[in-house]
From Swiss-Prot:
This is Large ribosomal subunit protein uL2c. Residues 225-252 are annotated as: Disordered. Gene3D superfamilies: 2.30.30.30, Nucleic acid-binding proteins, Ribosomal protein L2, domain 3. GO terms for cellular component: chloroplast; mitochondrial large ribosomal subunit.
């Protein structure tokens, strides 16, 4: 992936950059793998806002992505690399030998025409999925399962990868992108390689409207609100928050407070915390 830098033709392009989409080989998605995606704009079934700063945005259709990789020992050919509006990574369309078509996350350096596999005894090559106990130490993996058969749940974002660092009995130890070190059952599947589109983090939107295209509404600071709207609000002119520590709009402690539940069921899996 490359980044296209815009010249200052207008105020909206002055600080703008975007992907050059050179890795995209097909513009229209596979119709059999599309589903409707309804926008709730952060509201629940009663119409109340449960997630702030959501609303608007371009209409999208969901692409069914195969996170389980459960078609074992059936070769698949990479037919195309496509854009997915629902995630920051690209997706690759696979044509299996038995005629089925599926999307997967597009790993870095996986090209159209490559042949990939899923299974226990498959080659250690980019795009192949296998149990963690068969992955050599030091190998970069992504789309890692937490429970065997459930499908990949972690290390799925663009440019991310985890590293297999140890094997001991029924567990495999991996180092996460956050530098957290944790244990995972050895029968969990993972895909070899790093997720592509790593330069997405270097893109500058350039104007507020591009945020709105993504369905993200403005975030307003509490200190500029009225007292009826936020605990930080009120005062004459530019005034401090008037409290010892910052709080959320509902009065709970914010900024620096640990949000992970104490005695969580998975605490025993974490060898070194990311914090």
């Amino acid at each position: 992936m490359g980044i296209r830098i815009y010249k200052s033709y207008t105020p909206g392009t002055r600080n703008r950059s975007s992907s050059d989409f050179v890795e995209i080989t097909k513009s229209k998605p596979e119709k059999s793998l599309l589903r409707k995606k309804l926008s709730c704009a952060g509201r629940n079934n009663r119409g109340l806002i449960t997630v702030r700063h959501k609303g608007g945005g371009h209409k999208q259709r969901y692409r069914l992505v195969d996170f389980k990789r459960n078609k074992l020992d059936i070769p698949a050919i990479v037919a195309s690399v496509e854009y997915d509006p629902n995630r920051n990574a690209r997706i690759a369309l696979l044509h299996y030998q038995d005629g089925e078509k599926r999307y997967i996350l597009h790993p870095k350096k996986l090209a159209v025409g490559d042949k990939i596999y899923s299974g226990i005894n498959v080659p250690i090559e980019i795009g192949n999925a296998m149990p963690l106990y068969n992955v050599p130490l030091g190998t970069a993996v992504h789309n890692v399962e937490l429970i065997p058969g459930r499908g990949g749940q972690i290390v799925r974002s663009a440019g991310t990868s985890a590293q297999v660092v140890a094997k001991d009995g029924q567990v495999v130890t991996i180092k996460m992108p956050s530098n957290e070190v944790r244990m995972i059952y050895k029968n969990c599947y993972a895909t070899i390689g790093e997720v592509g589109n790593a330069d997405i983090k270097n893109i500058r939107l350039g104007k507020a409207g591009r945020k709105r295209w993504l369905g993200i509404r403005p975030s307003v600071r509490g200190v500029v609100m009225n007292p009826c709207d936020h605990p930080h609000g009120g005062g004459e002119g530019r005034s401090p928050i008037g409290r010892a520590k910052p709080v959320t709009p509902w009065g709970k402690p914010a900024l620096g407070v640990k949000t992970r539940r104490q005695n969580k069921y998975s605490d025993f899996c974490i060898i070194r915390s990311r914090n």
